[in-house]
Amino acid sequence: MNKIELIELDEFNCGAGHIYSVAVDGADQTLYDLFLEENEGDYRAELGEIAHKLNTMSTWTGFTDIFFKLNEGKPGDGVCAITDLKGKLRLYCIRFGNILLVLGGGGPKSKLIRAYEEDPKLLSENLMIRAVSDAMAKAIREKDLTIEEDGSLSGNEIIELDNQ
């Protein structure tokens, strides 16, 4: 069983909502850090667009529907994706209303495929963020983790993933 730690990304927490990412099994880098590192060579402009969206949401708008490709997971799990304008790059995340966003990983989406399930990397990243969503839902139900009114998390921010 893997453990995940929810880590607040201070560079994006500017008043309209809180953004976290996930470190797996005590790793130094979060899934978002790895996403940036993996894509900085070929997708620098697209990463800039995604970072601009994250900054806009956390500073001004909150996490409203218009910024996301919704329903990227199971019904009701909050899993969605943020893309650049041309849809070349996809970042999976979990959205909790307009106040909390948990970033996972992602990668490039080829125009040759119709769905993430056709790409092993995107499928793997999607399944990981879905597992994080399930683990967070369980921790919230069991009162081990709380989403505060401002979107910050309190309680145990290290939780176990099932079946990973």
Residue ranges and their predicted role:
Residues 88-94:
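Short acidic loop-to-beta-strand element that houses the catalytic metal-binding Asp/Glu
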Residues 100, 109-110:
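A short acidic, glycine/proline-enriched capping/turn motif at secondary-structure boundaries
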Residues 94-103:
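Active-site beta-strand-loop-beta-strand hairpin of nuclease catalytic cores
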Residues 1-88, 111-164:
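Basic, Lys/Arg-enriched alpha-helical interface segments
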